[in-house]
């Protein structure tokens, strides 16, 4: 965060996210987090295998993703966390940390469980 604009932007990958209010009263956004890596053979651009945390299979990826939300994101919402951006929606050339593979043919996280977790995020959010 550069200290300007309408929101405090944080990128957190290597340590647990700890919510903190902005001293200027701006909205607090976790604008990059996660980055969990899962290689789906046959669905990658090349052999480069970058991600912030490598997981062996879809079950382990889901467990890590769900734990991340349950221990860090959901508790921060009532305290004032306004938005999050998981890294990342799709794999790209040299990064395998997407929810979808590079070719968009494999969804790495179970859609029904992801929908349920997203519902919990919405339910935890303050009502206007």
Segments predicted by a language model, with ranges:
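Catalytic cores of secreted or luminal carbohydrate-active enzymes
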Residues: 101-127
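Substrate-binding/catalytic cleft of secreted carbohydrate-active enzymes
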Residues: 1-105
């Amino acid at each position: 965060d550069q200290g300007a604009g309408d929101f405090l932007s944080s990128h957190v990958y290597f340590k647990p996210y700890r919510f903190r209010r902005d001293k200027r009263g701006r909205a607090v956004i976790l604008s990059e987090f996660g980055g969990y890596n899962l290689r789906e053979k046959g669905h990658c651009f090349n052999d480069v295998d970058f991600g912030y945390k490598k997981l062996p299979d879809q079950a382990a990826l889901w467990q890590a993703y769900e734990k991340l939300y349950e221990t860090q994101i959901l508790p921060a919402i009532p305290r004032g966390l306004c938005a999050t951006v998981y890294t990342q929606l799709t794999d790209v050339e040299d990064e395998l940390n997407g929810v979808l593979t590079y070719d968009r043919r494999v969804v790495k996280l179970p859609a029904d469980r992801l929908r349920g977790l997203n519902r919990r995020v919405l339910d935890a959010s303050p009502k206007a």
